């Protein structure tokens, strides 16, 4: 299952978009930043009617239709969980629970910081945190990434700080 990122960054308004999106950033995790965005959207969705919600999305450089796709996928996954008699969390997952759940699917996408400040990943691949990441300047000792993209360098996009002790039990 794949859904496009609802955040928009038009070339002529990149700085304004980055400022609008900054309200959801998390200093340790781009994944948590997406959760923050989801919660912000849900809060607005419950408070506003359709037209003001679309305006809120436009003002915050968010694609309304992609957010509806997020919502539809969430609803479908919730129904599947109910059909399988899986219980949903009563409380939102904390940082370790959220990231361990994601890490299970990204075990080949972890990296350890080197003395040079880049990261060494699987198969001795060296990569850097993409400048768009919310954790770029923090440079955690260990991280996981959802995506490695080659431009001028090999960059990790959508990254999160992880605890090295989480890796072995999940492998």
Regions found by a protein language model. Give the residues of each.
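Second RecA-like catalytic domain
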Residues: 1-171
């Amino acid at each position: 299952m794949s859904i496009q990122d609802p955040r928009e960054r038009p070339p002529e308004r990149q700085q304004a978009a980055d400022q609008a999106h900054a309200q959801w950033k998390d200093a340790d995790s781009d994944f948590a930043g997406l959760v923050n965005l989801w919660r912000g959207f849900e809060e607005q969705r419950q408070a506003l009617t359709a037209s003001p919600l679309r305006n809120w999305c436009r003002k915050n450089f968010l694609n309304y239709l992609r957010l509806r796709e997020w919502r539809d996928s969430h609803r479908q996954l919730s129904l599947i969980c109910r059909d399988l008699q899986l219980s949903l969390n009563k409380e939102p997952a904390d940082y370790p629970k959220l990231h361990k759940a994601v890490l299970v699917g990204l075990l080949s996408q972890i990296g350890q910081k080197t003395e040079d400040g880049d990261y060494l990943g699987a198969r001795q691949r060296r990569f850097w945190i993409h400048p768009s990441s919310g954790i770029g300047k923090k440079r955690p000792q260990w991280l996981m990434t959802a995506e490695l993209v080659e431009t001028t360098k090999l960059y990790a996009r959508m990254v999160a700080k992880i605890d090295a002790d989480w890796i072995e039990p999940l492998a």
